[in-house]
Amino acid sequence: MQQVDDAVARSGVDAGLLTLELTESVLVHDMDDAVGKMRALHAMGVRLSLDDFGAGYASLSYLRELPFAEMKIDRAFTRGIVRDAHAATITRNLLQLGRDLGIDVIAEGVEQDDQFALLGEQGCQLFQGYLFGRPMEAAAFRQRLVSP
């Protein structure tokens, strides 16, 4: 907590521009401790993201009880969305759930144009995956930002 507060203070950046991505394992390990820290981060203005939603033991109660600003749909659903009607139905409903709760939803693992198109048709507006770029070193990322 203090480390995040110090980093925000040192950088001079608005805490609302910072999003911390949490995995389910953080919540399962010590729920009471995690909840307290999450509420404190939220009070500072930090946005919280629930990673890999739909995989593992992620519970809908997390979305009800915890101050998440966004959730990321696990790639297990987006990977098969074009060929698997069940995956498409689950993804469509997770997108609707996010809209209804006022939570941004990011589709992870988008690697092909047909996945991107179908997710867009379902109302998805935020995407992550190799279709848009591969992981890169910080120097390469800076160069990409300044290149026309």
Residue ranges and their predicted role:
Residues 3-7, 37-38, 94, 114-116:
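Structural preference for long, well-ordered alpha-helical segments in enzyme cores
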Residues 17-32, 44-148:
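EAL-family c-di-GMP phosphodiesterase catalytic domain
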Residues 8-14, 80:
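Phosphate/pyrophosphate-binding loops at sites that engage ATP/ADP/AMP, CoA/4′-phosphopantetheine
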